[in-house]
Amino acid sequence: IRNSEKQHIWVGMARETAHQLGTPVSALMGWVDWLRENPEKTLDIVEEMNADLNRLNQVSERFSQMGSTPKLEETDLSELVKTVVDYLEKRLPSKGKSLKLVNEITSKTNIYANITLLSWAIENIIKNGIDAITQERGEVRIRLRMEKEEVRIQIHDDGKGVEKKDLKNVFRPGFSTKNRGWGLGLSLTQRIIQDIHRGKIFIKQSSPGSGTTFEIILPT
C-alpha cells in the first residue's frame, strides 16, 4: 500500500472510531439532561445509561477484533438482530422526524458468527438506512429468508436511494455521500461479512427516491 493510501486509511480509522463513540456519548449526555428534568424517574433510565456504557466498551473490542483472528460461535441470529434494533430504536433522531425500525426476524435461526463484529455490520447497514431518510417520516425494515445452506438478511430503507453511478463505489474505502461521513463504515461491514463470516453483501435494489435494499448472505 502506498504511503498516501496508508495515511488515508489511518485517518479514516481514527475518524470512524470517533464516529462510533459519538452515538453512546451523545445518548449519555441526553440521558443526563433528561434526568435533570425528571429526577423521580432515575430507575427507568439507569438501564439505558448502562447500555451506552457497555457500548463504549464495545467500540474498543470491535476494532481490536478486526486486527486479530475473530472466533465464530453458534449464535441465534434473531436474538442478535433484536439486540441491535432495541439499542438503536431508543436512540433514533426525533427532532422533526418520525422514524421506525421494523424487525421481521422472529424465529430462532442459528448460524456461526462473531457476535461483536456481525452486530457491528448489521448496525452499520441500519444506521446507513436511517441516515438516508431525509423526509419527515420513514422506516428501516429488516427481513430474513432461509435457503438450503444459507440465510439471507434484507435491510430496506425508504430513504433517498443511491445514484446509479455510485452503486459500484459504496463499499470502497473513503467513499461517502454524507457530509459527516468518512467512508469506512460500509467498507468495514463488507470485510466483516466476506472475510470473517465467508458471506456476501451487496445492494439488491436502489434508485433515487425509492430507497435502498442491502442483502447479506451468510452460511448456516
Specify the residue positions occupied by each region the protein language model found.
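Detector for a conserved hydrophobic position within an alpha-helical segment of the HATPase_c
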Residues: 193-194
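Conserved catalytic submotifs in the C-terminal HATPase_c
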Residues: 98-110
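Short beta-strand/loop element within the Bergerat-fold HATPase_c
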Residues: 139-149
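Conserved micro-motifs of the catalytic ATP-binding
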Residues: 68-71, 110-113, 177
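Short conserved segment of the HATPase_c
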Residues: 162-174
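Acidic ATP/Mg2+-coordinating residue in the GHKL
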Residues: 157
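Glycine-rich ATP-binding loops of the HATPase_c
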Residues: 197-205
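Conserved DHp (HisKA) dimerization/phosphotransfer helix of two-component histidine kinases, i.e.
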Residues: 44-94, 98
